[in-house]
Design a protein with these regions (language model features):
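N-terminal signal-anchor/signal peptide hydrophobic helix marking the start
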Residues: 6-16
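Alpha-helical transmembrane segments of integral membrane proteins
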Residues: 2-3, 93-126, 142, 165-303
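Membrane-interfacial helix-loop-helix junctions in multi-pass membrane proteins
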Residues: 51-60, 75-85, 163, 185, ...
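Membrane-water interface segments at the C-terminal ends of transmembrane alpha-helices
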Residues: 23-30, 68, 132-161, 178-180
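An internal, D/E-rich "acidic patch" concept
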Residues: 55-112
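Hydrophobic alpha-helical transmembrane segments of membrane transport/permease proteins
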Residues: 15-64, 157-172
Length: 303
């Protein structure tokens, strides 16, 4: 187990290094520079700006200086606002983290519950309703769901104030982000639950007179949750990427909307920092998921 964790940590660090390398050189390969705008600047001004931000140095030197700063928690400054990027991330990430955490918890809790109900009431009307819901939701991307929710609640019902938290709505963005992973977890739980209920140890437990409650929640559900756990890592990645659009739609000042804005404004240092920051979260989430997966089911051999 210890060797596996060390191996995965090394692989995670290498992955983040490759992402930083690709992001850095991709940003520098873009023909249009960060200081180009509709209002032309003189060569002297451009030269002064490049010298100020160290963009006049060789790319290898720039990358070395950039990574040296990152390792000390310094992502540099925004080329558009001249603010420290660490401060911008520190202000906006808690908003995205709250939104993402609520969406993930909603997806997991309701997905497991609905999937279990569908499995236990297979081929009956609750199962058919849940399957219809899953099929409908999985066919729509999150931004379409967000648009429909806005139209229904805000325009048709006019109850936008009932779902506000401070200056930002929280329920509708959480629903927009959680419905797609919730549908997938529902389908995954149902399949795993049906498979678990058909195993020999379940039949043995029933033959011994074990209470139905214990059979379902202690034996069947516990094993059915293992595939769900493996999905948590990719789900977090999906929620992070989906939040970029959702935060823009609902005008939430989280890290996702900041990322979209910095792309629009060609704020290259902000793009690199945000990409690297989100990559660390996604790689870390997948690493933790794999370790928890191994702990829950020691029979699984991970290379």
């Amino acid at each position: 187990m210890g060797k596996y964790i060390v191996k995965r940590v090394i692989l995670a660090i290498f992955t983040i290094f490759i992402i930083s390398l690709i992001t850095f050189f991709a940003m520098n390969a873009i023909p249009c520079g960060p200081f180009n705008s509709e209002k032309a600047k003189s060569p002297a001004v451009m030269k002064e700006l490049e010298a100020r931000y160290g963009l006049d140095q060789p790319l290898i030197v720039q990358y070395k200086n950039y990574m040296a700063g990152v390792l000390h928690g310094d992502f540099g400054v925004s080329l558009k606002t001249d603010r420290p990027i660490s401060d911008i991330i520190g202000e906006s990430f808690p908003i995205s983290a709250k939104l993402g955490l609520l969406a993930a918890l909603t997806a997991i809790v309701f997905g497991v519950v609905l999937g279990s109900i569908a499995a236990l009431m297979r081929n009956r009307w609750p199962d058919r309703v849940i399957v219809f819901f899953v099929t409908l939701i999985t066919s729509m991307p999150s931004f379409v769901i967000a648009t429909l929710l806005l139209y229904f609640f805000c325009i048709k019902l006019g109850v936008v104030q009932a779902f506000s938290s401070g200056s930002n709505m929280i329920l509708l963005p959480v629903l927009s982000l959680s419905l797609s992973p919730m549908a997938y977890i529902t389908r995954l739980t149902k399949t795993s639950m049906l498979d678990a209920l058909g195993q020999d140890y379940i039949r043995t437990a029933k033959a011994k007179g074990v209470h139905q409650y214990k059979i379902i929640f202690v034996h069947a559900l516990r094993n059915a949750l293992i595939p769900v756990i493996t999905y948590v890592g990719p789900m977090i990645g999906g929620i992070l990427t989906g939040s970029m659009v959702i935060e823009s739609i609902f005008n939430i000042g989280g890290l996702g909307s900041k990322f979209v804005s910095c792309i629009t404004n060609r704020d290259y240092t902000m793009i690199m920092a945000t990409t690297l920051f989100l990559a660390v979260i996604m790689v870390g989430a997948n690493l933790i998921t794999d370790i928890v997966y191994k702990v829950i089911d020691p029979r699984i051999k991970l290379d």
